[in-house]
Amino acid sequence: MRALLLISTICLLARALAAEVKKPAAAAAPGTAEKLSPKAATLAERSAGLAFSLYQAMAKDQAVENILLSPVVVASSLGLVSLGGKAATASQAKAVLSAEQLRDDEVHAGLGELLRSLSNSTARNVTWKLGSRLYGPSSVSFAEDFVRSSKQHYNCEHSKINFRDKRSALQSINEWAAQTTDGKLPEVTKDVERTDGALLVNAMFFKPHWDERFHHKMVDNRGFMVTRSYTVGVTMMHRTGLYNYYDDEKEKLQMVEMPLAHKLSSLIIIMPHHVEPLERLEKLLTKEQLKVWMGKMQKKAVAISLPKGVVEVTHDLQKHLAGLGLTEAIDKNKADLSRMSGKKDLYLASVFHATAFEWDTDGNPFDQDIYGREELRSPKLFYADHPFIFLVRDTQSGSLLFIGRLVRPKGDKMRDEL
């Protein structure tokens, strides 16, 4: 059955190419980005290392299905803790980021520069709406110096919140997130367990704008196999083009790199050959291994099919960051966040990292000159109808805008597969 679907996809792609190749292609505007300073480049490398450590920690959590992390935003959250902390509370935040050898001013200036560069949606021609807000109990007043510095470096807002009326407090948090993302992320959380400390909330909406768009008329309903015995109905989008591609026969995986508009970043997908839990691939996934795989990629004709739609994920990163060494800030009896309020009256109760990530067809027009090439007649197939890992990578610094996995997209159960 799956083989028939693949054959039908190729036929549909061929017809779509014939229909669209006649359209003139507008040249994409070249991307321009200022070169990062040495301190920002160093922190870009450190944040990439953090990305894999945190992803691996979360992947081992049986309660976690889909994962969506923005490592640069997580790094900024650690910078914020370092900015507001003293003694071990501050030094642990830097250590988790592997930035203990950097001065405090280098960390904050470097992370601020990196965050501004990677989240510049105009230069990158992507949609990335990002907001960070630190909520404190109504009894706490944030220090003016901290408010000013955290806004300057991390564009972080601050607010008091009264959890005596928990329903109203949750509504306020979710309304702020919805407003920040233009309604794309309607809810961060349904509940907050610890209400006597500070809550750090990151709310994001990200939508890639492809360097060459998918066929907007070639969208159909297919099955996504969460497991061999559980399939959900999803909308799939398709296109054929020339991409960096690698098929690892030994490890039974394939990967493809898709440039985003302006080519300042790209989306990389790593997928097992067959339906299986991602645990095997995740054990292989490191910053060094990714570099090895990317070094083996070659430009190939690839017919790509991806799920279309919005994936919404909220993670409370508190326990996962604690597992990486951030133990003082989250401990009510040990936390020293006195630079935040002037007193040792705060601890980090939750770190909500909430993202809506939209997979859509939008992008630049096709380069029509490539479609007469012989190699496009027999493309490699990249049919993402089962769980996969993905990364959005900055082409200049190697920093990761996002790292995640799609295990269970939105969709109704279809039928059990044999």
UniProtKB/Swiss-Prot annotation:
Keyword Glycoprotein: yes
Any single biological process term in GO: collagen fibril organization
PANTHER family for the chain: SERINE PROTEASE INHIBITOR, SERPIN, SERPIN H1
Pfam families in UniProt: Serpin
Locus of motif Prevents secretion from ER: 415-418
GO molecular function: collagen binding; serine-type endopeptidase inhibitor activity; unfolded protein binding
Alphabetical UniProt keywords: Acetylation, Chaperone, Endoplasmic reticulum, Glycoprotein, Phosphoprotein, Signal
Modified residues (N6-acetyllysine): 207, 319
Superkingdom to which the source organism belongs: Eukaryota
Signal peptide annotation: 1-18
Modified positions (Phosphoserine) in chain numbering: 141
InterPro entries: Serpin_CS, Serpin_dom, Serpin_fam, Serpin_H1_serpin_dom, Serpin_sf, Serpin_sf_1, Serpin_sf_2
Glycosylation sites: 120, 125
Matches recorded under SUPFAM superfamilies: Serpins
Annotated compartments: Endoplasmic reticulum lumen
One GO CC term on file: endoplasmic reticulum-Golgi intermediate compartment
Sequence similarity: Belongs to the serpin family.
Gene name per UniProt: SERPINH1
Protein name: Serpin H1
